[in-house]
Amino acid sequence: MATLEVLRFPDERLRTIAQEVAHVDDQVRVIIKDMLETMYDENGIGLAATQVNIHQRIVVIDVSEERNEPLVLINPQIIKKDGTTVSEEGCLSVPNSYAKVDRAETVTVAALNEQGEEFVLDADELLAICIQHELDHLQGKLFIDYLSPLKRQRIRKKLEKEAKFAE
């Protein structure tokens, strides 16, 4: 297993639309293991493959307290949304930035697991929010895209300044 580099906004590769996974095989399972290791190493609760410059429809999530209940979603699709909720979100690709985002309160998602088997999952609370956030990444969308242009520009400038200091 390997820790992967997480792309940071404003990296344009984050805007890539992910492609369907044609076959769930050992190569895909290695990607999943590396993504989980990266997510845990970065103290995240979710990670989309596009965030680590792999442009396939793969998401890993773990919202459990003990960080021992990983959820793998391959080729996920939200098939039902209900209600609305506002949540404060952050993102490994937009470090140290948080904003309130409107999301569906509950979602039903259809996906493949790491054995390539289809399943359907009903999610609410943090899991529903995380699923929506990560699936946005697969479409090249970031949580800051829900913000006003002014707020988005402030975050961009802040991250560019932090990147200069890190060099």
Curated annotation (Swiss-Prot):
Q: Which domain of life is it from?
A: Bacteria
* Gene3D superfamilies listed in its UniProt record: Peptide deformylase
Q: Which residues bind Fe cation?
A: C91, H133, H137
Q: Per the annotation, how and in what number is the cofactor bound?
A: Binds 1 Fe(2+) ion.
Similarity field? Belongs to the polypeptide deformylase family.
Q: Known NCBIfam families for this protein?
A: pept_deformyl, PRK00150.1-3
Q: What is the protein name stated in its UniProt record?
A: Peptide deformylase
The gene designation is def
